Amino acid sequence: MPDQPHTASRPPLATRGADLEHLTRETWDVLIVGGGIVGCGALLDAASRGLRAALIEQDDIAVGTSSRSSRLVHGGLRYLEQFHVGLVREALHERARLLELAPHLVRLEKFLFPLYGRPAVTRSFYESGMVLYDLLGSAKRGGRHHHLSVDAALELAPDLRREGLQGAMLYSDGMEDDARYTLAVLRTAIREGGLAVTRVTAVKAIRDGGRVAGATVRDELTGVELDVRAAAVLDATGVWGARPDRPFGSEKATFNVLPSRGSHILVPRERIEVRTGVTIRVPGKVAFMVPWPRHWVIGTTDDPFTGPVDRPSASGPEVERILAAVNSAFDVGLSREDIVGTYAGLRPLIAPSGASSTVKVSREHKVAVEDRGLVRISGGKYTTYRLMASDAIDAVLGADAKDRPSGTADLPIIGAAPRPELDALIARLSREPGMDVESARSLVDRHGTEAETVVELGRRRDLIRPLVAGQPMIEAEVAWAAEHELALSLDDVLARRMRLAMTLRDRGESIASRVAAIAGDVLGWDAPRQAIEAARYLEGAHREFDVPA
């Protein structure tokens, strides 16, 4: 099917109203609760099998864990130390698949792993790990790792701490924009026939004759409660499954969810001179410096979390630990003043009995049929979402799964095209009035083949200009987000569609009114409503993404 937005020319809120009516009129084969990467992947998986499938999300798509990762598509080097070989192999195979299915959103990046300590012991220990990583699948698309001398390592990373440096390993791993990838999976599912409605909360299960037969839901924009009927419900709520008041709680629950907080900082790229990504060994784990267009995304922590799961933020001690990790490997004296933003996500780990630390808790996932008509999934890694989704829909179908297999292994994500075609599109768009190579590349890296349609929208509405002076994103992307990407607030646009909430030191105060005006033109906001929306966004953005005290 062609890569066309599902909303056509209808106003987004009118379309949402029609979708809500459809949601309550139909009896679905499966109702998916949760709009993270697993829920969106499950909607696509179900649609690929020809099922009548719907998804509800209480807030925005990818508002939780799926927009707050380290932005890596990887096997997980550190899991080899814990002997989770099967998990690493599975993740590396999926990394190769995602590079094929979404080359505009997933790419390979070189990572430098500096080696410190006794030369023979250090090199042999990490060399064996890298060889195993290659054998398990990393070499399939990324090539084999290389050992670098001290001089070669310093050529790539002049700011490396020289004392005790024994050289480095150079290997490849994948990276992506997690929020935009999740959104693209959802929009692909809609293209394939799935239905998704945001700002709809599951209140309680509907039970019929001892089985779960749907859910009573609440439209968060109106407060109205509605009944949605389904042959099966899939609970893909992630860390929200740790709440004792979850709507699909069951006496037959086979596992508990243990939230683990992973925090990150963002630092200007020019602050640390390195030509690759970096993997830093710290006691008990590794930290990553992931190259973003103008920033380093640095993290992560791994601590049990017992606070509210909505909108977590980094803590002061976590930020200090991340700074210490960077300064242990680089002679840069990185400090809090260098940080432009922070963020935190919660991993929905499967809790082993008596666990006091999350560092060594398995990242494998579990699927359970907890009641007739109720399937629950949690755990896992972002990289393996497609397999998780397939397992979940297999459980929904039960014995019928073998006759209706998943079709996502070869289903390109919306906006995908071979890399040469994407490069040609960048060259073509860079010649458009008001565009240059950086803005064209920025558009294609986030929208793929749809970048051309975004530019056409911008031409029609006079929105081909930078949203932020000196940065590549254009105003047309705000209108596109509101019209075609299910964005209903400034937070949706700036935190997840454009990722500016965490990369601008002012959290977007200088552009909030302009963004509200552009989005408001699509969403029907008058001037007072625009001011309210801008103020609401800024209050939340400062709370979530500012450097903590």
Predicted regions and their residues:
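Extreme N-terminal leader/targeting segments of oxidoreductases
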Residues: 1-30, 45-49
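Core beta-strand elements of the Rossmann-like FAD/NAD(P) dinucleotide-binding domain
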Residues: 26-28, 222-232
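Short hydrophobic core segments
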Residues: 33, 228-238
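Glycine-rich Rossmann-fold phosphate-binding loop(s) that bind the pyrophosphate
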Residues: 34-36, 58
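Glycine-rich FAD pyrophosphate-binding loop
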Residues: 47-67
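C-terminal accessory subdomains/tails of enzymes that are appended
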Residues: 59, 105, 116-129, 148-163, ...
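Dinucleotide-binding Rossmann-like beta1-alpha1 core, especially the glycine-rich loop
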Residues: 71-156
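A conserved short coil-to-beta-strand element within the FAD-binding core of flavoproteins
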Residues: 198-213
